[in-house]
């Protein structure tokens, strides 16, 4: 049965936990209208298709009933104005529940099909594109291979369930990771990842229109290095190219992912879709013409309001969870709060949720030099007093509108004369440095590769060599943005890996030596003895 919540259609099987009441500004959100059809429930009588009026209302509105077309088990409302007792409760004892038994027209389509703008063939095509996105870098994994073996069957079955609103997220796999920090990760089933990419491909281009320029996480053309470049640009602007002192506000949100309120997240997403649905992309083409807003509403609601801990499969020992603080675990999150880490939609949802906060900092507080990556924000200003005055307003906005708060220990103001750290980079006057933690991680990766090649007594598969090459180039490529070639030289100059890999003079990249490559091209397995 469909129900209305703030004039937005939900599916009744998707629970909306409201253990924490949403702010008044969210509850007062204007009605969301993705199409021009009426969302009011069925009334007594039927809708005249010619005039648009109601016919055969009669004296008694008895069409809400526990049994189809039955008056015996429902309240009987008398519309006769001369009747002293307009509400006839003669069947009150049997009126335990009601459901609509008459529609506007006798030939109305089922709601799930009526709201579907896409044809099933178009949905199959979009699911195929989503499948290709979901399997990137994972094509040789078991789940994508199993899906690919019966590709047409799985795609058609998934499209049918989405088209008829029968799709529900499957139980997730839960495990603990320890690098770079200990975290709890919920991995969705591969089919659910396909659906997540379907929704992402639908609404991400539209969401990009609402985000500020300096929101860096999980956006095409943005990322950590882009964020570092912008932060360095802010520093140079505030200090007038390092000629004057300036100050940096480091703002961190406490327990961000675990404290996201699902009801607020859903309403923010609905407001965003409603705001841009009628806007034009090009001449005569609106977003509503190319994006099925009702499908986006259905999928986003199903994903947001799912409980990841329901029937989840834990991988690992229960002891793996002991070092994890309870406030960082979904198993201890209050009902109706928290989204999982490990899903492509979680990344987009995190940006949608904090978009009002970004707009507040930029437009209301006047922080021109403000940028954010997930829950870590930086603001640069010429005076310390300005930043100090902004902190209470920022914290108040987070608490009143988003039910979040600034971390009291990690939120601080520092001078640009000292360390200016953001996203693993320390930006100084003449150059940017890589933080010690990143250098230590690169050293650990090199030592691990050395142990694999030196201490292993069995031949290694050809893939192992190319995996090692990818790991080396990932670290060297990142360090090259910080001009850390001297550090890379100290780590790799005397390494046994030099017998397998050749490094560029500035240590920006590595390649497999030609003589080693010839061996790998001849044999699937090879053992190179290093000294």
Locations of the language-model features?
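Active-site-proximal segment of RNA-dependent polymerases
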Residues: 108-109, 114, 200-261
């Amino acid at each position: 049965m469909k129900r209305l919540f703030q004039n937005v259609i939900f599916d009744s099987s998707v629970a909306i936990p409201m253990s924490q009441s949403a702010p008044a500004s969210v509850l007062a959100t204007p009605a969301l209208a993705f199409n021009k059809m009426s969302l009011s429930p069925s009334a007594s009588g039927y809708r005249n298709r010619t005039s648009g009026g109601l016919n055969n209302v009669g004296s008694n509105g008895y069409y809400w009933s526990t049994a189809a077309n039955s008056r015996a088990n429902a309240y009987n409302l008398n519309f006769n104005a001369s009747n002293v007792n307009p509400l006839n409760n003669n069947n009150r004892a049997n009126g335990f529940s009601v459901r609509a038994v008459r529609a506007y027209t006798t030939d109305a389509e089922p709601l799930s099909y009526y709201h579907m703008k896409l044809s099933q063939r178009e949905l199959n095509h979009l699911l195929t594109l989503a499948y290709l996105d979901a399997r990137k870098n994972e094509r040789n994994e078991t789940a994508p291979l199993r899906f690919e073996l019966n590709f047409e069957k799985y795609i058609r079955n998934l499209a049918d369930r989405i088209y008829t609103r029968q799709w529900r997220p499957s139980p997730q796999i839960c495990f603990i990771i320890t690098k770079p920090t200990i975290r709890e990760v919920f991995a969705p089933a591969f089919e659910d990842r396909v659906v997540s990419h379907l929704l992402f491909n639908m609404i991400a281009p539209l969401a990009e229109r609402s985000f500020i320029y300096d929101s860096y996480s999980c956006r095409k053309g943005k990322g950590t290095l882009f964020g570092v470049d912008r932060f360095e640009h802010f520093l140079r602007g505030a200090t007038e190219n390092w000629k004057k002192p300036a100050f940096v506000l480091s703002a961190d949100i406490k327990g961000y992912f675990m404290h996201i309120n699902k009801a607020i997240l859903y309403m923010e997403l609905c407001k965003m879709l409603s705001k841009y649905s009628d806007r034009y992309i090009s001449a005569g083409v609106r977003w509503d013409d190319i994006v099925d807003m009702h499908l986006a509403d259905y999928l986003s609601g199903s994903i947001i309001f799912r409980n990841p801990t329901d029937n989840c499969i834990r991988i690992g020992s229960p002891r793996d969870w002991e070092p994890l603080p309870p406030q960082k675990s979904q198993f201890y999150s209050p009902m109706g709060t928290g989204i999982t880490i490990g899903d492509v939609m979680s990344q987009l949802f995190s940006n949608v949720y904090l978009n009002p906060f970004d707009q507040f900092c930029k437009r209301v507080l006047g922080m021109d030099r403000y940028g954010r990556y997930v829950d870590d924000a930086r603001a640069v200003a010429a005076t310390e007093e300005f930043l100090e005055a902004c902190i209470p307003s920022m914290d108040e906005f987070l608490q009143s509108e988003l039910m979040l708060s600034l971390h009291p220990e990690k939120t601080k103001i520092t001078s640009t004369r000292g360390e200016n750290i953001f996203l693993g980079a320390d930006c100084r006057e003449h150059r940017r440095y890589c933080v010690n933690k990143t250098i230590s991680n690169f050293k650990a990766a090199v030592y691990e590769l050395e142990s694999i090649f030196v201490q292993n007594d069995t031949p290694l598969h050809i893939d192992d060599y190319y995996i090692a090459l990818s790991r080396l180039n990932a670290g060297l490529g990142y360090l090259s943005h910080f001009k850390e070639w001297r550090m890379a030289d100290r780590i790799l100059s005397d390494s046994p890996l030099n017998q397998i890999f050749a490094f560029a003079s500035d240590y920006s990249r590595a390649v497999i030596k030609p003589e080693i490559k010839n061996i790998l091209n001849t044999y699937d397995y090879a053992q190179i003895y290093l000294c």
